[in-house]
């Protein structure tokens, strides 16, 4: 009978199937988003509450931190690995694995945690909200993360333009010292840990981890060749882990609530909650914490009030900050906001800074402006980046006017491919990908613009 039913395509009801197979595991989650308030880690993103120590304590920061520290590095690393947390700065490397690289037998050199708060990517402003309105989350995260990797101090490298944020952070650090939460015998755990703030001077390239280390050491912010990696030779020649602000700030909550709790959000390999910036042509630009793998359309419509002029007025979206390729409206309809789904869509999650562009946007001019930014911020160390991005910038300026030949589109694509993957750091990639996204999805717009320019030029010549 069962064989006949199989031939007919008939399947057992779910409960009966479970009883026959003995499989009692819960069904896989298939819908994502609508994060509940009680599951939010960042509860003061908009600065409606007191950001100082008293307010932070009332919101659950520094709760049972001593117990977390006393459980030791292996336990903390275990929870972080269980959580499935991946780096929130753009690369998406598994955090537990990265932090565990520091747990080698000591050779006598001190270990350091460096927090990358040099948030200079156009469209990205999530970390500054944490530092400005929830600085104690970051300070506590430094302590917990430092304990996990056996570090003795944390250096928070903050963007030079973040004046108010640096001030708030310094106040939070002073309060933590005065309360005995950091410093000698931090939280009464017997563990000594210091936190220092280093202010940058406006160079976007210092967001790259080795350029950041060079800057802390007082040198020019130019990326280093790897290997050696920072976990072996980092700041002051000592083992160092460089981590993003959001990555560090969520670690105490993961340890308090458990890695399994955090892993319950989002798809497999894309777990947890995430801060998203939504800017551009939306009714209510915002920074919001939402579940990973939330549909992009739902994210924009629920939290940002939708696209100006309605969803049908959408032209394209840059989903992860200026260095990720844009995606057109047709892709935005169904794509999920996580690492794997966006890679499949030929883009990336990056910093999760969603830049929305409606049909009023000159898409060619918008991308050309981003290329000008990368040309300006290139440190000039690598020839493909120094020469290639400058060349792309000049070509894109002509593309904006339409003063080019269709064959130059393929030439521009080729030069972007010669830059991508051929530089010491990822700035070259960040300049190449927006161009590739434009050509991939808006080639007809480029060709039409060139055709219009040629017709106008011919008409002017005929008139003269």
Curated annotation (Swiss-Prot):
<dbReference type="GO" id="GO:0008137">
    <property type="term" value="F:NADH dehydrogenase (ubiquinone) activity"/>
</dbReference>
<keyword id="KW-0496">Mitochondrion</keyword>
<keyword id="KW-0007">Acetylation</keyword>
<comment type="subunit">
    <text>Core subunit of respiratory chain NADH dehydrogenase (Complex I) which is composed of 45 different subunits. This is a component of the flavoprotein-sulfur (FP) fragment of the enzyme. Interacts with RAB5IF.</text>
</comment>
<dbReference type="Pfam" id="PF22461">
    <property type="entry name" value="SLBB_2"/>
</dbReference>
<dbReference type="InterPro" id="IPR001949">
    <property type="entry name" value="NADH-UbQ_OxRdtase_51kDa_CS"/>
</dbReference>
<keyword id="KW-0560">Oxidoreductase</keyword>
<dbReference type="GO" id="GO:0051287">
    <property type="term" value="F:NAD binding"/>
</dbReference>
<feature type="modified residue" description="N6-acetyllysine">
    <location>
        <position position="104"/>
    </location>
</feature>
<keyword id="KW-0813">Transport</keyword>
<dbReference type="InterPro" id="IPR054765">
    <property type="entry name" value="SLBB_dom"/>
</dbReference>
<keyword id="KW-0830">Ubiquinone</keyword>
<keyword id="KW-0809">Transit peptide</keyword>
<feature type="binding site">
    <location>
        <begin position="199"/>
        <end position="247"/>
    </location>
    <ligand>
        <name>FMN</name>
    </ligand>
</feature>
<feature type="binding site">
    <location>
        <position position="382"/>
    </location>
    <ligand>
        <name>[4Fe-4S] cluster</name>
    </ligand>
</feature>
<protein>
    <recommendedName>
        <fullName>NADH dehydrogenase [ubiquinone] flavoprotein 1, mitochondrial</fullName>
        <ecNumber>7.1.1.2</ecNumber>
    </recommendedName>
</protein>
<keyword id="KW-0288">FMN</keyword>
<keyword id="KW-0679">Respiratory chain</keyword>
<comment type="similarity">
    <text>Belongs to the complex I 51 kDa subunit family.</text>
</comment>
<dbReference type="Pfam" id="PF10589">
    <property type="entry name" value="NADH_4Fe-4S"/>
</dbReference>
<dbReference type="GO" id="GO:0006120">
    <property type="term" value="P:mitochondrial electron transport, NADH to ubiquinone"/>
</dbReference>
<keyword id="KW-0411">Iron-sulfur</keyword>
<feature type="binding site">
    <location>
        <position position="385"/>
    </location>
    <ligand>
        <name>[4Fe-4S] cluster</name>
    </ligand>
</feature>
<dbReference type="InterPro" id="IPR011538">
    <property type="entry name" value="Nuo51_FMN-bd"/>
</dbReference>
<keyword id="KW-0408">Iron</keyword>
<dbReference type="GO" id="GO:0051539">
    <property type="term" value="F:4 iron, 4 sulfur cluster binding"/>
</dbReference>
<comment type="function">
    <text>Core subunit of the mitochondrial membrane respiratory chain NADH dehydrogenase (Complex I) which catalyzes electron transfer from NADH through the respiratory chain, using ubiquinone as an electron acceptor. Part of the peripheral arm of the enzyme, where the electrons from NADH are accepted by flavin mononucleotide (FMN) and then passed along a chain of iron-sulfur clusters by electron tunnelling to the final acceptor ubiquinone. Contains FMN, which is the initial electron acceptor as well as one iron-sulfur cluster.</text>
</comment>
<feature type="modified residue" description="N6-acetyllysine">
    <location>
        <position position="375"/>
    </location>
</feature>
<dbReference type="InterPro" id="IPR037225">
    <property type="entry name" value="Nuo51_FMN-bd_sf"/>
</dbReference>
<dbReference type="GO" id="GO:0010181">
    <property type="term" value="F:FMN binding"/>
</dbReference>
<feature type="transit peptide" description="Mitochondrion">
    <location>
        <begin position="1"/>
        <end position="20"/>
    </location>
</feature>
<keyword id="KW-0472">Membrane</keyword>
<feature type="modified residue" description="Omega-N-methylarginine">
    <location>
        <position position="257"/>
    </location>
</feature>
<feature type="binding site">
    <location>
        <begin position="87"/>
        <end position="96"/>
    </location>
    <ligand>
        <name>NADH</name>
    </ligand>
</feature>
<dbReference type="GO" id="GO:0005743">
    <property type="term" value="C:mitochondrial inner membrane"/>
</dbReference>
<dbReference type="InterPro" id="IPR050837">
    <property type="entry name" value="ComplexI_51kDa_subunit"/>
</dbReference>
<keyword id="KW-0488">Methylation</keyword>
<keyword id="KW-0520">NAD</keyword>
<keyword id="KW-0249">Electron transport</keyword>
<dbReference type="Pfam" id="PF01512">
    <property type="entry name" value="Complex1_51K"/>
</dbReference>
<dbReference type="GO" id="GO:0046872">
    <property type="term" value="F:metal ion binding"/>
</dbReference>
<keyword id="KW-0999">Mitochondrion inner membrane</keyword>
């Amino acid at each position: 009978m069962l064989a006949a039913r199989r031939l007919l395509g008939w399947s057992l009801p779910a409960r009966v199937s479970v009883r026959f197979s003995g499989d009692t595991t819960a069904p896989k989650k298939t819908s994502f988003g609508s994060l509940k308030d009680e599951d939010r880690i960042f509860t003061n993103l908009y600065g409606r509450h007191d950001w100082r120590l008293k307010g932070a304590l009332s919101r659950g920061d520094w709760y049972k931190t001593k117990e977390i520290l006393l459980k030791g590095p292996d336990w903390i690393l275990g929870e972080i690995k269980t959580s499935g947390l991946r780096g929130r700065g753009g690369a998406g490397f598994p955090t537990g694995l990265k932090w565990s690289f520091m747990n080698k037998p000591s050779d006598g050199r001190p270990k350091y945690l460096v927090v990358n708060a040099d948030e200079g990517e156009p469209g990205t402003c999530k970390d500054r909200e944490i530092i400005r309105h929830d600085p104690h989350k970051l300070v506590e995260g430094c302590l917990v993360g430092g304990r996990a990797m056996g570090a003795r101090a944390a250096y928070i490298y903050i963007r030079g333009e973040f004046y108010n944020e640096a001030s708030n952070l310094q106040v939070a650090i002073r309060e933590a010292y005065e309360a005995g939460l950091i410093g000698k015998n931090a939280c009464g755990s017997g563990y000594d840990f210091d936190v220092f703030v280093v202010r940058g001077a406006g160079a976007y390239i210092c967001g790259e981890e080795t350029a950041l280390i060079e800057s802390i050491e007082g040198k020019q912010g130019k990326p280093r060749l790897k290997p050696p990696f920072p976990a072996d030779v980092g700041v002051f020649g000592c083992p160092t882990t460089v981590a993003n602000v959001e990555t560090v700030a969520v670690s105490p909550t993961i340890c308090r609530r458990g890695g399994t709790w955090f892993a319950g959000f989002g798809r497999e390999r894309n777990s947890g909650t995430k801060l998203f910036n939504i800017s551009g042509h939306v009714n209510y630009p915002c920074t919001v914490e939402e579940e990973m793998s939330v549909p992009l359309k739902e994210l924009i419509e629920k939290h940002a009030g939708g696209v100006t002029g309605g969803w049908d007025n959408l032209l394209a979206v840059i989903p992860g900050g200026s260095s990720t390729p844009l995606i057109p409206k047709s892709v935005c309809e169904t794509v999920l906001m996580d690492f794997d789904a966006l890679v499949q869509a030929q883009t990336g999650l990056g910093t999760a800074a969603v830049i929305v562009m409606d049909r009023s946007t000159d898409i060619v001019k918008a991308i050309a402006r981003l290329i000008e930014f990368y040309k300006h911020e290139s440190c000039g160390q690598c020839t493909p980046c120094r020469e290639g991005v400058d060349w792309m910038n000049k070509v894109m300026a002509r593309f904006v006017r339409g003063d080019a030949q269709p064959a130059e589109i393929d030439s521009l694509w080729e030069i972007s491919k010669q830059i991508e993957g051929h530089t010491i750091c990822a700035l070259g990639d960040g300049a190449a990908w927006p161009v590739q996204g434009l050509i991939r999805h808006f080639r007809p717009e480029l060709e039409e613009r060139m055709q219009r320019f040629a017709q106008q030029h011919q008409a002017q010549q005929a008139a003269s």
